[in-house]
Amino acid sequence: MRELNRALLARQLLLDRARITPLAAIAQLVALQAQLARPPFVGLWTRLHAFTRAQLHQLLHDRHVVRATFLRGTLHLLTAGDFLALRAALQPMFTAGFRAILKDRAADLDLAQLAAFATTRLPATFEQLRPQLARQFPRHDERALGYAVRMHLPLVQVPTDESWAFPSSAAFDSAESWLARKPGTSGALGDLDALDALDALVRRYLAAFGPATIKDAQRWSGIADLAPAFDALRPELVTFRDDKRRELFDLPGAPRPPAETPAPVRFLPDFDNLILGHDDRRRIVADEHRPGLTTKNLQVKATFLVDGFVAGTWTLVRARHTATLTLAPFAALARPARTALEAEGDALLTFVEPDATSRAVSIPR
């Protein structure tokens, strides 16, 4: 399991802070979960040398990076080129998802007509858009209409000058309008149909999360059946067996460092795909600790790594001029780990709360 852990950390830029551009890092990771606005910034800070907020703000405002519905039907940050090229692979999952949720409420919904009308009302927040949809399509439920638009129409969120680039209720625009290109055409990988996009998505997944099983890739992407895609790519891949004799796929030449490779302490943000990227997550967190990583309302907590594995969770609270980082370790921490976490935690506080006049890292003994 340590070999899989070190391979994952290497590909996730967590063995050493990478000296690459934020755009290159986002491409390497495929997509950063962005249900909340702050986590992608922290996720890049923990992986990159000398990363600043301004760098990601610039990429978003220059339209090189977008925040959009992507993996698992949730908001992610990814490069504009990848969104254009890879989204087609996910559309069948989006369509199946909204039909399963809406059931008879979407039975006679004309999606093409709905999308065409919605496009004329963008950019807008969904709070602004839903009433307009309801007036235009009065026989359908307002929220069902909004959800259908979100799952059927390629949309991106419009960044602002907020600290973390997006307000809690951000406006959406059509990807074609925002990027001046249609998804599926002229992307970073060229013009791809849905099948080509699916093959590309599998390769990119393995580059960022391999070696991995088919079920791992399905859990990460939200796509129900990736076996045909893996079978088509099998001649180009290498395979291994894990401790349960399950078949793992990988790219030839992808980094697989030795198990004894040192791994520094690292802080991961809420919803980080390092935690969500596999069906079997033992390579990053012990099974007995998994229930403690999710809140009652299914929020994935921010975590920290010691020796490459999740060793606890963290919260950050700002009270007036004081910022406090509180760690909740799963077990007692050795002195070297505590010292390293205190130093790394202070750096995290400086990044997240640069104007705080007092900062503290609290680690229970």
State the predicted function of each range.
Residues 1-275, 279-281, 286-365:
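Long, low-complexity intrinsically disordered regions
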